[in-house]
A protein has these predicted regions:
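Ferredoxin-type iron-sulfur electron-transfer modules and their immediate structural context
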Residues: 2-218, 222-224, 253, 257-260, ...
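Strongly charged, low-complexity linkers/loops
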Residues: 220, 230-238
Length: 298
């Protein structure tokens, strides 16, 4: 009986000693936490999406307080919360237009296939099988890796088979951009409505042969733009959003409907008629000027 009592006493004493050692160690080696971290954390989205590049919202809050991340590092939190975090950190509120994701492909059912893929319905998996089923090496595969990555319900596969973004739901967290194996998703200003929905850098004939909606780098959009807001770069049209005013002239001259929102056939014909009338008027004016000059020379 005494052996049992001694064993209990020894274990109790050891437990007390170890507990005391741990208590002292916790005080000595305690890592002081900045109280601002909790305040910053309360203004983050709480989705732990990882779009900021840090391990969860707590990691993002710690990075902001440490000065390793900007106060607007959490895109889903929005401008209002970014301003609140800036106030906590004693900084000026960040300014800048809201950004949303945009998928640079509108090929879908109009993109030619090399073979019928019947494997795992995932874009990353599909690209590992002979580089994917599409003839176009730049096209959206349409299996929804980006849709699965989005925690805000902003991504879906559109009627034509390509991924599309709901700008009202998009927080520009970047999860879809990371998930896309072809890097087709980019950030664009939310207020801008005209976008080039193609990333194909192949030359005209090659691009034309793989998709009915591909940009062929013809440069008609570049020539038509009055604001110098669109240029062909590496074989594909690129919009300068700082210059673009959304006039949509580029959509009316694009022969491939690669610029969204695509103009209807009626709008294109109407615009062609206007351009023809302008050309005829200019030609008539030039002819009249030449005749007048010839008459005065006699």
């Amino acid at each position: 009986m005494m052996n049992v009592i001694y064993a209990i006493l020894v274990l109790g004493i050891l437990g007390a000693v170890f507990g005391l050692v741990l208590a002292v160690a916790s005080k000595i080696f305690e890592v002081k936490k900045d109280p601002r971290e909790e305040a910053v954390l309360s203004h983050l989205a709480g989705a732990n999406c990882g779009g900021c590049g840090f391990p969860g919202c707590a990691g993002c809050a710690a990075a902001i307080v440490a000065g390793d991340a900007p106060v607007n590092a959490c895109a889903p939190a929005g401008a209002e919360n970014a301003a609140a975090i800036a106030e906590i950190m004693g900084q000026a509120a960040p300014t800048g237009e809201r950004q949303v994701a945009f998928v640079r492909c509108n090929g879908g059912v109009n993109a030619k296939k090399r073979f019928e893929y019947r494997g795992v319905q995932d874009c990353i998996s599909a690209t590992k099988v002979a580089a994917g089923p599409l003839d176009c090496a730049f096209g959206c595969l349409g299996f929804g890796s980006c849709v699965n990555a989005c925690q805000f319900g902003a991504m879906s596969i559109g009627p034509n088979g390509s991924a599309v973004v709901d700008p009202d739901k998009c927080t520009n967290c970047g999860a879809c951009m990371t998930a896309c194996p072809r890097h087709l998703i980019t950030s664009v200003p939310a207020s801008k409505k005209v976008h080039v929905a193609c990333a194909n850098q192949d030359k005209g004939k090659a691009a034309m042969s793989v998709c009915a909606n591909s940009c062929i780098g013809c440069g008609l959009c570049q020539k038509e733009c009055k604001k110098d807001a669109i240029h062909v770069v590496n074989g594909v049209a690129v919009i300068d959003y700082e210059k673009c005013v959304g006039c949509k002239l580029c959509t009316k001259v694009c022969p491939r409907d690669a610029i969204l929102p695509a103009a209807t056939a009626e709008e294109k014909e109407k615009y062609k008629a206007i351009k023809k009338a302008q050309a005829e008027k200019a030609a008539a004016a030039k002819k009249a000027a030449e005749e007048a000059a010839a008459a005065s020379a006699q």
